[in-house]
């Protein structure tokens, strides 16, 4: 449960803006719950807009993935690339190909990638890409 006013306010903004992305909202809430004690001890984070910058991607790219099936028919799927934070280095994050992929899923994975990458000693930012293309059974 979020108790800090700054954390609650930023989470409410995320809910309003990204309410159609439940995977992303869940990840943000869990991270905010973990960060809340630190944010309470450091009011300067609010002035610097740390949480606002953390949850807003630098770039969101949505594109089509066109391919030809075994019968020669052109199929079109959606692809996404979310680039969250390059403050400590270039974006690093893998690709996911699965029918369940949507913008919210890739946004959630990219958000978590920032935190994962920050735990390494390498200068890498966070990002993720993917498509709702299902590679299973394709030649």
Segment roles from a protein language model:
Residues 1-139:
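N-terminal ligand-binding/catalytic initiation module
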